[in-house]
């Protein structure tokens, strides 16, 4: 690599770092995080995962102290492994708030890098790749996810969507079918945000149906290989998930579309985008932002002049925008598998991707790619981002929104387990249990002085006195995989009203409860780990050749 090329790459890296920093400016200058929408749930996930990593448990399945020590299966249904960088920041001594912003910066940088790689891999043009990276990483809907909704999983999904689409692109439009990339990216989407992974799969099916003529034997083979590899790489999550849902019915099985999504209109989207603000979550205004809205309008007015590719991208963007609003009859699917999206405006994630791609395509077609013009577009995006962030910070301040700080993060709303309590067994009366977090003996909450509890990281112990044979519901939310002991004797346990339940004979009992995980969890994790290791080894050996 010559000196000039090295300087260009260094400049690109610096710009990507700039984009990443701007995405969280000026939030990272504060010593607090505004508590909005999903923040309290993710605050708890982040802190509990940090605790499990300290005990070298990277796949905890159940966070034993989450939910007032009742133990919550967040990791069973919402994977935590990608939170590892945050845990590392905490372990090396960085406090909660700066660790949170460092983690957000890292996510933004990965998003900027993967989106740059996406377009560079297709076009082999650095300026276009840099512009797309800027538009996509600083897309307003991504900023809403990141800093207004605190939707950590969906923010992570933004980072891997470009790799997923690149994998699909290579299978259908090139001779080099990168089906392994498609598998890895889908596995990362699953590990990030299951809803986004599910809708990525739905959109892939729609794409295949629309492009069936391109689906020859080679494409079908690559898709099947990719699907099989995805199942293998994600077995550590998918099979334990299916195991739990086969035996138990959870609250998320009854998901319906929320009114805030069903009432979201196209006029709402346009006016919100023009305003360049989203407001705190109580007055959330989902949108794609002023810049991308202008891009879509320009593309529509100049549609006949556009290149074939830009016409296709325009149509894809418009379709996704309309799907995100109530122009599409979402009410028909209010109680269906499609209702897992909760809010149809979540599709603005995909709209933002294609609108950013459209913006880059228009700039290329209209030949606005001089170095000065490229820097001008980056400056415009940066300015709008700062404006958006500052406006939202100001509104949160003016409404005296609750804040999470380094002092209160661990004891602030300790019982928080998410808005919908999705990962509790259906009809679990968590409010009753939280009000009296003690064993329930034959349906009566125990208050006997002999009944004592001791909660450690990997087990909880209870000293109980029973009169005759009695049924005892322990203060632990039930998931398959618990082990209950009376002294050294392992007891059979089962679910009753959402709690781990056992039957005890007459006398005083020393009960210990620990989540030992299931055979399926252990074997599937081992399989996925070995498969991932083989893929990495194959990649490294290929690099050496």
What is the predicted role of each segment?
Residues 19, 28, 33, 64-67, ...:
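Compositionally biased, intrinsically disordered low-complexity regions enriched in proline and serine
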Residues 324-326, 344-347, 370-451:
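Transmembrane helical bundles and short interhelical boundary loops of multi-pass, membrane-embedded
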Residues 60, 104, 162, 240, ...:
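Proline-rich low-complexity regions
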Residues 1-395, 521-545:
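Membrane-embedded transmembrane-helix bundle of lipid-linked glycan/lipid transferases
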Residues 37-38, 47, 57, 75, ...:
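Acidic-enriched, low-complexity/disordered segments with a strong bias for Aspartate over Glutamate
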Residues 2, 52, 81, 89, ...:
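Generic signature of intrinsically disordered, low-complexity segments enriched in small/polar residues
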Residues 6, 431-545:
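Active-site-proximal, structured, solvent-exposed surfaces of multi-pass membrane proteins
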